[in-house]
């Protein structure tokens, strides 16, 4: 019955993705909608009373945990490869500074003053979740609405800077708790240097070792973030390109149809949504839904004003909404925190719901088309509102 549930879940995600595309939604939005609303209803009305299966039962098989580790490592590796592939741009840095700092500070304040007492690293994680954005989803959305290439590059580089800061801060904060959990991944991250000393230069070998060791690190609960960031930085220093384990098209299909649905389902079935909403309280729930979005929009607005207009006719309001998009990065981060028991199930659900709202905001604001006047270069030093 457990295997039947997981097959059914994958089929439901495939159907949701297909239906969403008919309405112009990118896959991650359809998947978030199903995970946030459909799966909890399915668990409450059918799986738990009818099949007599709890969330703990559904995630207990060893084969499923191995498949989860593999899927998580593939997604984390892909995200980190996007983060590390950075060509620093001064305008992107101007946007990223307030876009990260303001929601991060707001998240820390929320964790300390509005949420129940928790370890400092959990409060840090809440601050980072307020600030994080979504590189793949942002890029796909910008491409979907035919946003100007130069403006797209600037926004994506801003997202990369923010995500790199979030992942790196959390990785070292986590490693500081247990020195052994920091040293072992750092030693593994130096493998590219050893391979170069052995005169081995094939990018496929470096990349294969990266994904294999990332799976091992995730499976044995080592600090996969420290390993992943360090390994890719070594590869970048050696000018060795990362080669994905599968062709790009196949990798995209694997993520869309298996890895992302598996990770979303693995997280959401562990949550009793009714109890989660009751335990949070109205003020806490409202804060977790509204403050991340509001503080992120404020940071984006200030950063875009500091950096200046990206093209004639660009709107600070529209670009602020675009940089508020969450998605895959947030999902992976949330699951990482939930599996390590650094956040509660109710906090997981509230922030996933917030991420869905933030990701839908550009579409709800009517951003299906870009401004007509996009060809002329910018003359003003400030973006239009």
Language-model features and meaning:
Residues 1-9, 58-75, 118-133, 177-190, ...:
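Structural signature of hydrophobic alpha-helical transmembrane segments
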Residues 43-45, 86-147, 277-373:
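Transmembrane alpha-helices that form the ion-translocation and gating core
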Residues 25-34, 89-102, 149-160, 200-209, ...:
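Cytoplasmic-side transmembrane-helix entry/capping segments in multi-pass membrane proteins
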Residues 7-10, 14-21, 161-245, 253-256:
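Core mid-bundle transmembrane helix pairs that form the ion/substrate translocation pathway
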Residues 11-25, 74-89, 136-147, 190-201, ...:
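C-terminal ends of transmembrane helices
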Residues 40-91, 208-286:
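Membrane-interface junctions of multi-pass transporters
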Residues 147-171, 245-247, 314-319, 342-352:
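Membrane-interface alpha-helices at helix entry/exit sites of multi-pass transporters
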Residues 43-48, 107-112, 163-176, 212-226, ...:
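Hydrophobic alpha-helical transmembrane segments in multi-pass integral membrane proteins
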